[in-house]
Protein backbone atom coordinates (compact mmCIF):
# COMPACT_ATOMS: atom_id res chain seq x y z
CA UNK A 1 0.00 0.00 0.00
CA UNK A 2 1.72 3.08 -1.23
CA UNK A 3 -0.66 5.57 0.33
CA UNK A 4 -1.84 5.56 3.92
CA UNK A 5 -5.61 5.96 3.93
CA UNK A 6 -7.99 6.18 6.91
CA UNK A 7 -9.30 2.60 6.54
CA UNK A 8 -5.74 1.26 6.36
CA UNK A 9 -4.68 3.16 9.47
CA UNK A 10 -7.84 2.06 11.30
CA UNK A 11 -7.24 -1.58 10.45
CA UNK A 12 -3.56 -1.34 11.37
CA UNK A 13 -4.38 0.23 14.72
CA UNK A 14 -6.87 -2.52 15.52
CA UNK A 15 -4.60 -5.36 14.41
CA UNK A 16 -1.56 -3.97 16.23
CA UNK A 17 -3.06 -5.00 19.55
CA UNK A 18 -3.15 -8.65 18.45
CA UNK A 19 -0.26 -10.98 19.11
CA UNK A 20 -0.32 -12.92 15.88
CA UNK A 21 1.85 -12.64 12.81
CA UNK A 22 3.51 -9.63 11.28
CA UNK A 23 1.10 -6.70 11.43
CA UNK A 24 2.36 -3.69 9.51
CA UNK A 25 0.87 -0.76 7.71
CA UNK A 26 2.96 -1.12 4.60
CA UNK A 27 3.33 -4.50 2.91
CA UNK A 28 4.47 -6.74 5.74
CA UNK A 29 6.87 -4.36 7.41
CA UNK A 30 8.45 -2.73 4.40
CA UNK A 31 7.85 0.91 3.67
CA UNK A 32 7.53 1.15 -0.05
CA UNK A 33 10.00 3.32 -1.89
CA UNK A 34 7.72 6.07 -3.17
CA UNK A 35 4.87 6.91 -0.79
CA UNK A 36 2.22 9.40 -1.86
CA UNK A 37 3.45 10.48 -5.27
CA UNK A 38 1.53 12.81 -7.52
CA UNK A 39 0.57 11.29 -10.89
CA UNK A 40 3.29 12.98 -12.98
CA UNK A 41 6.06 11.88 -10.62
CA UNK A 42 4.53 8.42 -10.33
CA UNK A 43 4.24 8.08 -14.10
CA UNK A 44 7.85 9.13 -14.72
CA UNK A 45 9.68 7.50 -11.84
CA UNK A 46 7.70 4.80 -10.05
CA UNK A 47 8.76 1.27 -10.86
CA UNK A 48 5.86 -1.12 -10.26
CA UNK A 49 7.93 -4.20 -11.08
CA UNK A 50 10.64 -3.32 -8.55
CA UNK A 51 7.96 -2.57 -6.01
CA UNK A 52 6.27 -5.93 -6.62
CA UNK A 53 9.55 -7.82 -6.44
CA UNK A 54 10.43 -6.04 -3.19
CA UNK A 55 7.41 -7.62 -1.47
CA UNK A 56 7.81 -11.10 -2.99
CA UNK A 57 9.38 -12.49 0.19
CA UNK A 58 6.41 -11.24 2.22
CA UNK A 59 4.06 -13.38 0.16
CA UNK A 60 6.43 -16.35 0.31
CA UNK A 61 6.59 -16.25 4.10
CA UNK A 62 2.88 -15.86 4.81
CA UNK A 63 -0.13 -18.10 4.37
CA UNK A 64 -2.98 -15.70 3.61
CA UNK A 65 -3.48 -12.03 2.83
CA UNK A 66 -5.58 -9.37 4.46
CA UNK A 67 -5.75 -6.92 1.57
CA UNK A 68 -6.52 -3.25 2.13
CA UNK A 69 -7.84 -2.17 -1.23
CA UNK A 70 -7.45 1.36 -2.57
CA UNK A 71 -11.11 2.24 -2.27
CA UNK A 72 -13.15 1.81 0.86
CA UNK A 73 -15.75 4.54 1.25
CA UNK A 74 -16.55 4.86 -2.44
CA UNK A 75 -19.92 3.47 -3.49
CA UNK A 76 -18.39 1.62 -6.43
CA UNK A 77 -14.83 0.52 -5.96
CA UNK A 78 -12.29 -1.23 -8.09
CA UNK A 79 -10.22 -4.31 -7.50
CA UNK A 80 -6.54 -3.48 -7.86
CA UNK A 81 -3.20 -5.23 -8.08
CA UNK A 82 -3.27 -5.64 -4.30
CA UNK A 83 -5.92 -8.37 -4.51
CA UNK A 84 -4.49 -9.77 -7.74
CA UNK A 85 -1.05 -10.09 -6.08
CA UNK A 86 -2.60 -12.25 -3.36
CA UNK A 87 -4.24 -14.40 -6.04
CA UNK A 88 -1.00 -14.86 -7.99
CA UNK A 89 0.87 -15.59 -4.74
CA UNK A 90 -1.58 -18.42 -4.04
CA UNK A 91 -3.02 -16.86 -0.91
CA UNK A 92 -6.49 -17.19 0.47
CA UNK A 93 -7.52 -13.57 1.04
CA UNK A 94 -9.89 -11.32 2.90
CA UNK A 95 -10.34 -7.75 1.67
CA UNK A 96 -10.90 -4.47 3.49
CA UNK A 97 -12.46 -2.66 0.58
CA UNK A 98 -15.59 -0.97 -0.71
CA UNK A 99 -19.03 -2.33 0.15
CA UNK A 100 -19.57 -5.54 -1.82
CA UNK A 101 -15.89 -5.89 -2.75
CA UNK A 102 -15.89 -9.69 -2.50
CA UNK A 103 -18.94 -9.88 -4.75
CA UNK A 104 -17.06 -7.71 -7.25
CA UNK A 105 -14.09 -10.09 -7.12
CA UNK A 106 -16.46 -12.98 -7.86
CA UNK A 107 -17.97 -10.90 -10.67
CA UNK A 108 -14.52 -10.76 -12.25
CA UNK A 109 -14.52 -14.57 -12.35
CA UNK A 110 -12.46 -15.34 -9.25
CA UNK A 111 -13.50 -17.40 -6.25
CA UNK A 112 -13.35 -16.21 -2.66
CA UNK A 113 -13.04 -18.18 0.58
CA UNK A 114 -16.41 -18.29 2.36
CA UNK A 115 -15.45 -21.54 4.11
CA UNK A 116 -12.44 -19.81 5.69
CA UNK A 117 -13.74 -16.28 6.21
CA UNK A 118 -17.18 -15.03 7.11
CA UNK A 119 -17.77 -12.72 4.16
CA UNK A 120 -20.90 -11.00 5.47
CA UNK A 121 -18.79 -8.06 6.66
CA UNK A 122 -18.59 -6.79 3.09
CA UNK A 123 -22.22 -5.62 3.26
CA UNK A 124 -21.82 -3.43 6.33
CA UNK A 125 -21.74 0.36 6.05
CA UNK A 126 -18.37 2.12 5.84
CA UNK A 127 -18.02 2.94 9.52
CA UNK A 128 -18.92 -0.62 10.55
CA UNK A 129 -17.23 -2.77 7.90
CA UNK A 130 -13.79 -3.11 9.50
CA UNK A 131 -15.38 -3.81 12.90
CA UNK A 132 -17.56 -6.49 11.33
CA UNK A 133 -14.63 -8.01 9.42
CA UNK A 134 -12.60 -8.33 12.62
CA UNK A 135 -15.53 -9.40 14.80
CA UNK A 136 -16.56 -12.13 12.36
CA UNK A 137 -13.04 -13.38 11.56
CA UNK A 138 -10.44 -12.10 14.01
CA UNK A 139 -10.82 -14.45 16.96
CA UNK A 140 -10.27 -17.53 14.83
CA UNK A 141 -7.02 -16.28 13.37
CA UNK A 142 -5.56 -15.20 16.69
CA UNK A 143 -5.88 -18.80 17.93
CA UNK A 144 -5.03 -20.90 14.88
CA UNK A 145 -1.81 -22.91 14.98
CA UNK A 146 0.72 -22.95 12.18
CA UNK A 147 -0.09 -26.59 11.44
CA UNK A 148 -3.82 -25.87 11.28
CA UNK A 149 -3.15 -22.91 9.00
CA UNK A 150 -1.14 -25.11 6.62
CA UNK A 151 -3.97 -27.66 6.65
CA UNK A 152 -6.52 -24.93 5.96
CA UNK A 153 -4.57 -23.73 2.93
CA UNK A 154 -4.16 -27.31 1.69
CA UNK A 155 -7.91 -27.89 2.04
CA UNK A 156 -8.52 -24.90 -0.24
CA UNK A 157 -5.90 -25.76 -2.84
CA UNK A 158 -8.60 -26.20 -5.50
CA UNK A 159 -9.72 -22.56 -5.13
CA UNK A 160 -6.13 -21.30 -4.93
CA UNK A 161 -5.22 -23.18 -8.12
CA UNK A 162 -8.42 -22.14 -9.89
CA UNK A 163 -7.82 -18.45 -9.14
CA UNK A 164 -4.20 -18.54 -10.25
CA UNK A 165 -4.99 -20.49 -13.42
CA UNK A 166 -7.93 -18.20 -14.21
CA UNK A 167 -5.74 -15.14 -13.74
CA UNK A 168 -3.06 -16.37 -16.14
CA UNK A 169 -5.26 -18.16 -18.67
CA UNK A 170 -8.57 -16.32 -18.89
CA UNK A 171 -8.77 -13.09 -16.89
CA UNK A 172 -7.18 -10.82 -19.52
CA UNK A 173 -9.16 -12.19 -22.48
CA UNK A 174 -12.38 -12.15 -20.42
CA UNK A 175 -11.87 -8.50 -19.46
CA UNK A 176 -11.06 -7.57 -23.06
CA UNK A 177 -14.24 -9.29 -24.28
CA UNK A 178 -16.25 -7.52 -21.57
CA UNK A 179 -14.82 -4.17 -22.70
CA UNK A 180 -15.61 -4.90 -26.33
CA UNK A 181 -19.18 -5.80 -25.43
CA UNK A 182 -19.59 -2.62 -23.39
CA UNK A 183 -18.29 -0.47 -26.25
CA UNK A 184 -20.52 -2.18 -28.79
CA UNK A 185 -23.55 -1.68 -26.53
CA UNK A 186 -22.79 2.03 -26.28
CA UNK A 187 -22.67 2.51 -30.05
CA UNK A 188 -25.62 0.34 -31.06
Locations of regions flagged by a protein language model:
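Pol beta-like nucleotidyltransferase catalytic core
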Residues: 1-67, 73-188
Amino acid sequence: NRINKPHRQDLYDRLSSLTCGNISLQSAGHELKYPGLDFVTYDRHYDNLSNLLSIKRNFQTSMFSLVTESQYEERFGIITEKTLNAIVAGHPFIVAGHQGCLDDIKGLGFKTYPTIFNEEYQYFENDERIDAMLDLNGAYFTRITTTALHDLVDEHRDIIDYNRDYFFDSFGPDRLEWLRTQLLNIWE
